[in-house]
Structures are given as structure tokens and as C-alpha cells.
């Protein structure tokens, strides 16, 4: 796998880890020139069509999550029989490694801070209707800067959904199971709260609350046994923190924190002032031991394969007996008739339930002595819980009690629009498409964002929209350029004003003798009219002056002592004569150019010479020409 290129984009560099369902590699994205992590499904899962469908759907949903405490999912892809997720590459280690390296409990404050960051991640995910189902230290990364990032949202959800629907087994780590997970029941967001409570217990004590010889024995303890307060194992744990852990790990989900934000609020309060925490007695009712019937169900699940094996042996023996009976029955037509009527069971015609609601379909099938089981939930434009498909189909002949498997609608898939403002447009497009959204790129000028970066989006981020909605993404073309105006034949003052109104500056002014043209008239400009240039660009001008042999004009050299300033300064020289003020020189200089000599031409007689520096009057002197 090392050196392989996936999707003509991701080059596999090295293996950095592996788990029960996938292997993780460090890779380079050649499109965006960045390092990423790629999780590749193990072949045994990639070969399971139902698992792959669930995996794709849930990974794409998880890709819509955008939060600093969640490992970002950039891409979900397939190449042949390889299914992979492209994720944010996190420099750091897992929380499990951190606990092992510490050789015992973490410092109390640090443990609570880590749990708080995980809570923030769960709160964001739960608000987006995504449950993790496999919160454990191995799925919590801690960066070198102590930023916590939760990973494996997509793969955990896909595994859980697939196994509940298709096998009845429970995938996950038994040490962190909630009681409802251990029983294989339907779970909600509170299962993550329980698991995080177990993780917090481990951070505070250096060990998990329950251990056993097998996953089943550990799962039974989660169902039946009380969790000790962490302070029993670590005297540094305050009583208030004991109560937080015990509330999060109540057997009854209704007695736990009901949301991650509730859990987070108590953790933050503990960090600020533990005495402000308020708990009610009902929060800590004695753990109710689950009925032995439910415990037995869990035990029986472990013996399921053994029973299946025995059933096969019984079926084999029954088959032999039936074969003997049929051979005997063939002795006469009358015997066959008797046996047929004795063993005959009337077949049932499967009714149509497609288009019905779940409750309606259940009633119809029950009336026909048939059972119903949900095989898949799928997003569609049909109302929630509407039957989309059935198997066996309408009209099929089946035995009474046969199970009809149905696919039901989850309604229209809704997604939260992620924030892509400030991202490179290729990255923004990838994030939105991974969230199941379409992208419409609109390019426009923008003064604040550099070319190629997103400066706006519509709908805005955080809005809930239907899966497949098109998002308008506004990409910057950079600052809007200025159009160079035509200033030829204008006098110099008019030309300067025209350039400034267009967002441009007057550059160098070069004087050229010209006959039959008024003095200070623009003869040429350095950039042609209607040309697009960057805002603030200087435009040089060639301006007319009277010929040297003119008896009406005289030229004198004006010596200017420039001020001592850092950087360049703009020097402009004006001649004020006969009630008119004319610009006769403009240029940029530094203090090192001092003294500056400027030739000034004026009509015979008195004139005032004004020197402006950076737009401010610097000096005025009267001269005679």
C-alpha cells in the first residue's frame, strides 16, 4: 500500500496505526499540497455490501461536522475494492497512550479539561443528529498543544447501524459500553454520555471500572453492578467530581445528563468553582439491577451459534425421517393423498405495503399472519416511516409467520451547511460536496480576500438545508481593478483630479516644449485609456511647456531643502501668477535628494512659488521673472 496513489490525488506515505475495522496511513494530498490521514477499511468489511452502504452514508454525514474538537473528514472515496476516508492529520497521541505514559491517573484539572473538550465535540455532533456510539480513549486524540479531537464518528456509526440491522451483534469496546448497548437495545445520544463518563473515570483512576475474562462478562457488569466513586481509587478526586462521574454513568439513561451541553456545564462549573455545583438526590438513585431475564438474553446471545449448530443437526435428522416417510408414502396413491393433506399448510399471499406508513404496514401484515422487520432506513422524498420497498414482493406465496423485510423512509435528508468562508475554493468545494451539497462557484472582486478564496456563501453556514441543495460560493478575484481614464488634452490639475477619482495616483510629470499648445496641457500618458490596472497604480504624464525662445516666459531654478523624513515623499511645485495656480513639477523623493533643484518657468513679472510635500504646503516664496 505504501507509495500507492488513491483517487489520483492521495499518495500513501506510511502506516501510522490500525484498529479492528480499518488501517490508518499518513498520506500527501497532491491537489492541495498538504498532509492528511487516510483510514482504509479492512477487506472483511469492504466485502460486506450492506456495511459499505451504511459506511458511505454515515461517513458523508460525519463529514458535515465542522468543529475544532472533531477530526475533520475531507473526503470519502472508493478505488476498486478499497474504501477509504480522508481525514485531518493530527500530530499527537491517543488518550489511551497518554494514560499509559502517565503510568496512573491524570492530574484532576487536566482530566476534566480533556472531558470538557470531548463534551463540546459530542454536543456539536448530537445537535447535528449524529451519535458516536464508540467513545473510548483510543478514539480521542490529544495534540501536542493539548487540543482534544474526537475521531471515528463515521465508522463507529456505520458499524453500529450495520450490526444492529443485519447480525444482532454489538460492535464496540465492552469496557466503555452503556448498559443499553450491552443489551443490544436502541440507543440515543445518552449512550455517548455514559461512555464519556467511563473515560473520565479511567483518566481519574488510571483504570476502567469493570474488568472481566470476556467482553460478555464486562458487559454484564455494566448492566448489573454499581460503579465506585473515583475517589475510592484516587483520594485526590473531590466529592463534586465523584458526583459528576456517577451522574454520567447511571444505568437508567433518564437519570444521566440528558445532553452533552448539560454535562459540559457541570464540568466547566467544576473548573471555575466546584461549590457552585447543585445535585438532586434523585440523580443518584441506587442502581437498579436489570432483571435476570435480560441478563439471560445477553448470555443466550453468546450461545447463539451453538444453538444454530444443534438446530442444523436436528434438521438433518428430521430430513432423514421425512425422506423415509415419503418413500413409504409412494407405495400407494391413497397414502400420498393422506400425507399431503396431513402436512399441508395453506400458503399466504403477500399483500402490498409499499407506500403505507410503518404502523399501517404492520397492521396489514399482521392481518395476513405475517411478521415485519425493518431491514434498512433510507432518506427519500417520501414522509418519514413510509414503506419504500418490501421483500418478499406483493403477490408472493409464503408460509404463515413469514417475515416481510421492509425498507422505510427517513424523510428528506437534512444537513447543516458547513462554514467555508476563508477557505481556498477547492477545499471549500470538497467540504460542501462531502456534506452532500452541490456547489455553484460565483467569482467577484473583493477588497478583503485574496484571489481564489471564499468571501461569502449562500445559504449561510449553520443553516439546515435538504441534502443535495446547491450552495452559492462567492470566490474572490482580488481587489477590483481601476480603469485608466483619458487625460490627454486636459491641463495638469484636471488630469490629476481625474486620475485620483479613478483610484489612481499621478506619477512622474515630464515637461516637453510644444508650440501652439497651452502651457501645462497633457500631451501623453504612460498607460493607454480604458486599461485595467491595480488600484493605486501611478500614471506618468508628459506635459507641455512654452519653448525656451519665448519672450513671454522665463525659467529660474528653485532650490528646495527637503525635510528629514523616513521613506519617500511626494514633492509638488506650483506657480501662482495672475490669479492662477499651475502645477509645474511633481515627483517622489527622499531626504537624501536634498537640496532639490527644480527649474520653474513663469511669465515675466512677480509670481509666488509654492512647494507642497505629501499634499501639505511646505513653503511659499515670492520671485520675480
UniProtKB/Swiss-Prot annotation:
Domain Protein kinase: from-to ranges? 10-271
> Domain PASTA: where?
344-410, 411-477, 478-545
Binding-site list for ATP: 16-24, 39
**What's an example of a GO molecular-function annotation for this chain?**
protein serine/threonine kinase activity
Which keywords belong to this entry? ATP-binding, Kinase, Nucleotide-binding, Repeat, Serine/threonine-protein kinase, Transferase
SMART domains per the record?
PASTA, S_TKc
As its record notes, the protein acts as a catalyst of:
L-seryl-[protein] + ATP = O-phospho-L-seryl-[protein] + ADP + H(+); L-threonyl-[protein] + ATP = O-phospho-L-threonyl-[protein] + ADP + H(+)
Q: Which InterPro entries match?
A: Kinase-like_dom_sf, PASTA_dom, Prot_kinase_dom, Protein_kinase_ATP_BS, Ser/Thr_kinase_AS
> What EC class does the entry list?
transferase
The coiled-coil regions, if any, are none
Q: What is its EC number?
A: 2.7.11.1
**Where along the chain is the active site annotated?**
134
What is stated as this protein's family in its record?
A: Belongs to the protein kinase superfamily. Ser/Thr protein kinase family.
Name of protein: Probable serine/threonine-protein kinase Sps1
Protein's organism: Caldanaerobacter subterraneus subsp. tengcongensis (strain DSM 15242 / JCM 11007 / NBRC 100824 / MB4)
